[in-house]
Amino acid sequence: MGYVTTKDGVDIFYKDWGPRDAPVIFFHHGWPLSSDDWDAQMLFFLKEGFRVVAHDRRGHGRSTQVWDGHDMDHYADDVAAVVEYLGVQGAVHVGHSTGGGEVAYYVARYPNDPVAKAVLISAVPPLMVKTESNPDGLPKEVFDDLQNQLFKNRSQFYHDVPAGPFYGFNRPGAKVSEPVVLNWWRQGMMGGAKAHYDGIVAFSQTDFTEALKKIEVPVLILHGEDDQVVPFEISGKKSAELVKNGKLISYPGFPHGMPTTEAETINKDLLAFIRS
């Protein structure tokens, strides 16, 4: 564990576990979480002989709570800084939710940085918000409401999201895991309110269409069909049609936070793709 300082002076926290000569998997977390959200994957792939790396996005987790730069361009630049510092070119990049958008932007923005493969899990691309050119997207008012809830009572908001739609705990018959809810809350409250507030705009209004089209490496897209946060029909399904060399796996009944609730299945499919 340590920090990388970016060209604009932001300290980015990272984890780097495993043998230096092992194949590398670089994990990108979702909003408003941290690298801790990848525990189930990092421990699994460490045992499988990989070197695993994850960072806390600027303003998230243990990274600097800077007030600006909360957009996909800066997110991608921060990833590039970590990659260069650790010398982990040629990694497989795995992103969940907003992290999936970050992966797409990084791969497209840095074509000269070797990347082995990319994985988008419950990811926000190609575009979440409804526009004239994206009539199937979610109304902007949905994201305005997220910002309003964060502004009014961030602590309560960060309990309601994981206790409800994020893990599908609001579905009939679902068994709520309070420790999972509290871990989500803990990660969210570690980060900065300004970063999270601006991050809602970044993940909802960024159009990743051209970035997806530029990706040359193999891409695995994993998405739950019961994702209440990033609906499958407007995201994973469309992204699979935009990438040149993509594979889509959808999971009936799986929620947005499936890397946690369905870790065994997700890890198995990730491992098969990475080793293929």
UniProtKB/Swiss-Prot annotation:
Q: Which Pfam families match?
A: Abhydrolase_1
Q: Which reaction does it catalyse?
A: 3,4-dihydrocoumarin + H2O = 3-(2-hydroxyphenyl)propanoate + H(+); peracetic acid + H2O = acetate + H2O2 + H(+); a percarboxylic acid + H2O = a carboxylate + H2O2 + H(+)
Q: Where is the AB hydrolase-1 domain?
A: 23-254
Stated pH dependence: Optimum pH is 7.0-8.0.
Please state what is observed when this gene is inactivated: Disruption mutant is more sensitive to growth inhibition by peracetic acid than the parent strain. The sensitivities to hydrogen peroxide and acetic acid are not affected.
* Thermal behavior of activity: Optimum temperature is 30 degrees Celsius. Stable below 75 degrees Celsius, and retains 69% of the original activity at 80 degrees Celsius.
Q: Which InterPro entries match?
A: AB_hydrolase (IPR050471), AB_hydrolase_1 (IPR000073), AB_hydrolase_fold (IPR029058), Epox_hydrolase-like (IPR000639)
**Activity control:** Inhibited by the serine protease inhibitors diisopropyl fluorophosphate and phenylmethanesulfonyl fluoride.
> Record's superkingdom?
Bacteria
Task: Give EC number(s), comma-separated.
Answer: 3.1.1.35
- Write out the similarity annotation: Belongs to the AB hydrolase superfamily. Bacterial non-heme haloperoxidase / perhydrolase family.
User: What role is this protein assigned?
Assistant: Multifunctional enzyme, which shows esterase and perhydrolase activities, and is capable of organic acid-assisted bromination of organic compounds. Catalyzes the hydrolysis of 3,4-dihydrocoumarin. Aromatic lactones other than 3,4-dihydrocoumarin, such as 2-coumaranone and homogentisic acid lactone, are also substrates, but their activities relative to that of 3,4-dihydrocoumarin are quite low. Also catalyzes the hydrolysis of several linear esters, with specificity toward methyl esters.
- Assembly and partners? Homodimer.
Q: What is this protein called?
A: Bifunctional esterase/perhydrolase DCH
According to its UniProt entry, this protein's organism is: Acinetobacter calcoaceticus
Gene that codes for this? dch
